[in-house]
Curated annotation (Swiss-Prot):
InterPro entries: PsdUridine_synth_cat_dom_sf (IPR020103), PsdUridine_synth_N (IPR002501), tRNA_psdUridine_synth_TruB (IPR014780), TruB_C (IPR032819). It catalyses: uridine(55) in tRNA = pseudouridine(55) in tRNA. Keywords: Isomerase, tRNA processing. This is tRNA pseudouridine synthase B. The keyword Metal-binding does not apply. The active site is at D45 (nucleophile). The gene is truB. One of its GO terms (biological process) is tRNA pseudouridine synthesis. It comes from the Bacteria. The keyword Isomerase applies. Belongs to the pseudouridine synthase TruB family. Type 1 subfamily.
Amino acid sequence: MELATELKEGILLVDKPQGRTSFSLIRTLTKLIGVKKIGHAGTLDPFATGVMVMLIGRKFTRLSDVLLFEDKEYAAIAHLGTTTDSYDCDGKIVGRSKKVPTYEEILEAALYFQGEIQQIPPMFSAKKINGKKLYEYARQGLSIERRQSTVQVSLQITKYEYPLLYFSVQCSKGTYIRSIAHELGNMLGCGAYLEELRRLRSGSFSIDQCIDGCLLDRPDFDVSPYLRDFNGNIL
């Protein structure tokens, strides 16, 4: 394919559309540019949107591990009063509560999510135990013992309109925002799940540098003018 031979290596910053899996977006890009060597610096759940760092070419894909360890920033909405098995909007409802937390109670609970905290990976996650992804166990109705991990977080409450609680999070690699919503709901005594999630930043790459992921579905779309180097500069 002529396009593939002319295409530069580089970083393509994409705003992932809601409802798309991260890997379907990568497959679409692979088909569009005819280059098989494509990596990423962190996936997003299907219901989530925002910054996906796509790495094109050997020079960039071989440093994916470095970029994966960069901190990230999110805007999120938790739905209070309802819990799901997956801790997010795609899960099965497993509990409801009529308790309506006060704003003061929410601010007090949010203080826990500052600095270093311990998290247990949710069962509906891609983390592997004994060579098998946790969500594969979960779909079989199994619950596997998981080890806690240490993460760094900084959570800020931005708006509260029951049952919706809006917040932003800056966090280290491996942080589950779904778990934060779930844990916050437990602390408030009403339960909660993650309704919406948008990644605003991944390392030094921000949402305002991204192209709309829907553009990759256009067979004539040229990604070359949007490729960047590690400093975010257009190549």
